[in-house]
């Protein structure tokens, strides 16, 4: 006796693309067939496709299972995750890594020797226990459900840009303080972090350097989150000044023009926890920096601080001018303390990698992508990106926004951050500066970046140039598409089904049980939808599911007589006439040219 098939649940149906299958199959390098891999990925992304007792952990185990053994290669999983952009020290993977090390320690004690990571093997229960705490990010990564789906290709393109810019020999290292003058002009680093925590680094990314004026962006974001934009902008404006970044001038309302010029940045720092003592204020900002950086390296260079303070005549002149015009909050009693705090924050040390995470937090609406912790409120995050776009590159801000079209902030140490909103943050570091105080290699890299990818703020993503590519884009033939065809068929939503057909969706697709949308429509008895699928979409009427049942069998089983008669006619057509429309059901309804009753015998809810 043939078992009764289960009815498709009302959920979105996700299928892996051929590109995803090929990419993962190559990475995993297993003996698993592409069809088995496809079914496994379906099971990971579509819970209703799995057996009741199977979880995502079981499906992932099957991906990395060693043939003929109840073991899987956890080392292979880690290798694949790295290729997809995730690092072993990613905070979201830390629970998994700790459990792996615990099991590996036990194994080493038994055999009295260390095992290379790539050879790590775990039993099914151990494997599942390891990945369970990090299952969300592991599942997303294996489905390439990330903002940059084809990570390996993207990283190769970035590496090419990095190497091209490495040959640039223009610019001079800043010399106004000894600590900057001693920097090697050959230092060159690029690090990026996406809003999903995918990361890549090139060059001297571990070399520490001071943030200098890059701190202005984060100081504004911190104080605006703490006090609110209205309070902050009662002291500082938002307009580009059109003047030198350290010029002694105010706007028409006697306020600094914006938080990115020196005068505005000094006032901004004076607003940070202005009622507390200096030590607590510094601790507060440093802790905020660490949160924004996902607890990656944040340090302090005291020598740079002392040198900045010793060469501060211009900033003192600015501060006294602002004090005369009552620009500071009333809590600011000592200009020396106010400037010391400003210089301290300019002397905070980072690496290219930690600053890239900070930039990606701004790209991610103020949420750190590797810890999922909200560090900056959404509106201040939006506002700081607007200010960086219009005022972030010293006296070249207008030129940079025109040519590159992305929010950015630079500093005289050679540091530079660039934000692609909702995509990634990039940190560039190269000490040689141009005549306007921006990193020569950094600016050149950004120009090459937007000439390669559709990242410029005003690049059209629809009618785009063939010269540029959009690494975010999932081509209709390649992307992992969320196809609601089974949901639509189950609901009898004919207008939506027609729209999906017009958009090029494959209405012949089948689920894990090889059931098609025609099977579902026949089960429900949706006459007009069946006629549309047969007469217009030309779906396969003979296709059998895993139980060997056709759509006609479904219609007969559920006693939908009119549908049965129509499908019988459709199946009796010779192969050469399969593209012809089948005559109407045996009803008195008038039929239009598309095979739809002009007055349907029932209403689709």
UniProtKB/Swiss-Prot annotation:
Region annotation (Disordered) ranges: 569-605
PROSITE patterns: ANK_REP_REGION
Domain of life: Eukaryota
Biased composition (Acidic residues): 586-595
Assigned GO CC terms: mitochondrion
A family per Pfam: EF-hand_14
Binding-site residues, substrate: 213, 262, 308, 315, 342, 394, 412
Family (UniProt): Belongs to the glutaminase family.
PANTHER family the UniProt entry points to: GLUTAMINASE, GLUTAMINASE 2-RELATED
This protein's name: Putative glutaminase 2
Organism expressing this protein natively: Caenorhabditis elegans
Chain's gene name: glna-2
